[in-house]
Curated annotation (Swiss-Prot):
Residue intervals passing through the bilayer: 33-53, 77-98, 113-133, 178-198, 226-246, 288-308, 320-340, 347-367
Listed name of the protein: Cytochrome b
Any further remark recorded for this protein: Heme 1 (or BL or b562) is low-potential and absorbs at about 562 nm, and heme 2 (or BH or b566) is high-potential and absorbs at about 566 nm.
Principal location: mitochondrion
Species lineage: Eukaryota, Metazoa, Chordata, Craniata, Vertebrata
Organism: Eliurus minor (Lesser tufted-tailed rat)
Cofactor note: Binds 2 heme b groups non-covalently.
Amino acid sequence: MTNIRKSHPLLKIINHSFIDLPTPSNISSWWNFGSLLGICLILQIATGLFLAMHYTSDTTTAFSSVTHICRDVNYGWLIRYLHANGASMFFICLFIHVGRGMYYGSYMSMETWNMGIILLFAVMATAFMGYVLPWGQMSFWGATVITNLLSAIPYIGTTLVEWIWGGFSVDKATLTRFFAFHFILPFIIVALVMVHLLFLHETGSNNPSGLNSDADKIPFHPYYTIKDILGILLLFLFLISLVLFSPDLLGDPDNYTPANPLNTPPHIKPEWYFLFAYAILRSIPNKLGGVLALILSILVLALLPHLHTSKLQSLMFRPLTQTLYWILVADLLTLTWIGGQPVEYPFVIIGQLASVLYFAIILIFMPMAGMIEDNMLKMD
């Protein structure tokens, strides 16, 4: 008799996706982050659901309701900090996942890659709206500054901003709709993840060598399930340590002050995971130019398959492009640091140089290095 997991219509899908899935035998721990992202998403939806049971999306009570969750709800403080720091874990895994895709040339599977970029935008939008909900000073002013960027769009900008606000400033209507969107988007993300996996399983996983691995495949379970469980345990160890020892390490002290439209904080800045994009935005003096650079800083990833000049897919055997890749990583860390600094000398010029370098490496230097390496290997 056929095993039920191979015959049952529902179990068959799970079987083909997580059990009998043919997987390259040589994928490294960098391939663990996809499953870690799945775990992060489940954790965020679970903790978010419990927070939503006690949260009120009204400007007069939002801040108090978050305080009430931390003080009066059983383990409310734990749920709240798991959710806040879980978002940071989510983005750490996301950045590593995208970075691995760039390093090993996974972007050559274009459908999967483009779906990933859409997912990245969706997660960033969700995280931004989530940051507004506690209605602290940084929540309010962050929402004001970032939504106000849309006013840079010619002709329809101001109307668009007021339409998003639901009035003439960030107020009750804005908070209510942000809560509604923050609640629904993760479920849309789950659907997008399924499409992402559908595209991935059409082509199969890439591997560190960048070569075709059809001749050397092993079943996903038990080899990679056990490997993923180790990754999940390490992720939880890191997350629980952060939540229990220093839950506010990655937050902003200003967000413990209730939102006040009459008092602007000295430095308005988003959460740490948006700082690199914020630094690119600030490095351009023109408002519209800054907004375009901000969007392009993520959208440039969609160009990677078209900018791939080498005959080798992975960077494993390409020392020149490898060097550029790690310079790019250092550059992104520099941008993250600059995004959290005040707008003054020398931070402005460092931010501008780092922004130019970011786009130059991706659009110019990496494609050039690919051609040089091909030439050195005489692969023509």
